[in-house]
Amino acid sequence: MKSIIEYLTHNYNEHKSLPAIKINDKKYSYEELFNKSLKVATALLENGASNETVAVIGHRNFSTYVGILGILFAGCSYTPIDPKKNKSKTIDIIRGSNIKHFIGQKSEIESLHEILAEEVSIFDNAESIITPCDTLNYLTKYNWIDLQDVEEYSPLEDFSRSDHSNLAYVLYTSGSTGKPKGVQVTVANLCSYIDAISELWKLPIGFKMS
């Protein structure tokens, strides 16, 4: 079975200049997607991420896809977070997956800062009054990667951290009947799905999927 990295690098090598993603009317090539993702991977590793779940903050935009692929290249797993949705669910996801690293655009990171600032007492089980200084100290416990700043990093060259036994992503239920529950999908699960789809559907170059 191929690894997820082998799938990604194969598509990159075969279709560098072709569109990989189309969002609204803008197209992004495999080369654009691949190169920026590798810089995200380097940023994560240089900031201490290691085979753990990383939060991607955002929506369906280019930066979010870059973040997801960068996390996979770094040998980590991702879980999506939307700060505009239920605040308590967001807190439960962060606590449930023991998130220490967050990736997003500046505005999205700031939105999450606001949510966490409101919930410092919940995280620390604090019984005392929470001051602005307490909040600032709390937020600095986490690693925040602004996707606009990753250009300063070199693209990752060593892909050996990715393993079939690693988690690929964790998706959370809505939590409508209680706390949201995380569904874990391994790299092996994801690769098996890709293998099956590849056998079932022989998709031509340029075929669009959503």
Stretches with model-predicted labels:
Residues 194:
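Conserved alpha-helix/loop element of class I SAM-dependent methyltransferases that forms part
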Residues 1-191, 201-202:
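Carrier-protein-dependent adenylate-forming modules in NRPS/ANL systems
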Residues 206-210:
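Gly/Ser/Thr-rich phosphate-binding loops and adjoining beta-strand/alpha-helix segments
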